């Protein structure tokens, strides 16, 4: 993730040290296995709106990967899945926070929005590959179809952003991580024209816990919430 925290590439580095040489070219996640003779790369690749497929590429910089599997159905391809923007904003502490933003083509007149809180705390979801939250990704497409703006935040405690981000919630869960949701709601209002009286929040597991904390402690920000399989 040298180029962006939401992109995974494969690099070659001499044993003696030096400058890493990037071998992969596809933006997303590249999970690489070397062939026994080290002449080929087997790449398990996905993008935001494209599930995992297998590619083969020569083990050299600039080589063109060739797709060798096609696993999705005609039904899947019949829908125009969105590529949400991967954005970043500064939270109240000055930390850069990454998020996925789904913008409706035809916004509901009430300008509503939904904030999604991923689970575990230590996961990463504001990235450029196919999410393990693919069901929520599909739901967010539906919400955008219905005129909602959706924000999916990698809040404090999420993985992929270094030690400080991971430890900012130490001994105070529902503090700095919840602040990021509130700051995200503020961003939606100030930058994207969302109605401040029409913002909801939802999530499962740790995201359910965060939803409960939001509803109990920030009712002036979030007008509705759905806490799924909450950690209590």
Residues of each region from the PLM?
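Flexible, solvent-exposed coil segments and beta strand-coil junctions
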Residues: 12-15, 78-79
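Short loop/turn segments that connect beta-strands within beta-propeller blades
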Residues: 14-18, 59-62
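Serine-hydrolase catalytic core recognition
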Residues: 31-232
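Surface loop/turn motifs at the tips and blade-to-blade linkers of beta-strand repeat domains
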Residues: 23-27, 70
């Amino acid at each position: 993730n040298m180029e962006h925290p939401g992109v995974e590439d494969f690099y070659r580095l001499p044993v003696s040290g030096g400058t890493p040489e990037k071998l992969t070219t596809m933006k997303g996640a590249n999970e690489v296995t070397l062939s026994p003779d080290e002449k080929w790369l087997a790449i398990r690749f996905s993008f935001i709106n494209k599930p995992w497929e297998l590619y083969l590429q020569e083990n050299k910089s600039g080589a063109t990967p060739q797709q060798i599997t096609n696993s999705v159905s005609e039904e899947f391809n019949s829908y125009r899945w969105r590529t949400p923007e991967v954005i970043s904003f500064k939270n109240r502490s000055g930390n850069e926070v990454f998020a996925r933003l789904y913008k409706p083509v035809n916004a509901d007149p009430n300008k509503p929005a939904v904030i999604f809180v991923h689970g575990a705390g230590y996961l990463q979801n504001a990235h450029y590959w196919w999410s393990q939250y693919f069901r929520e990704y599909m739901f967010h497409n539906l919400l955008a179809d219905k005129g909602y703006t959706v924000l999916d935040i990698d809040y404090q405690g999420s993985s992929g952003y270094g030690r400080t981000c991971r430890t900012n919630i130490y001994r105070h869960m529902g503090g700095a991580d919840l602040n990021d949701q509130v700051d995200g709601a503020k961003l939606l209002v100030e930058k994207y024209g969302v109605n401040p009286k029409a913002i909801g929040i939802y999530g499962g597991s740790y995201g359910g816990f965060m939803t409960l904390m939001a509803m109990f402690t920030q009712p002036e920000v979030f007008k509705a919430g759905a806490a799924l399989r909450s950690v209590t």
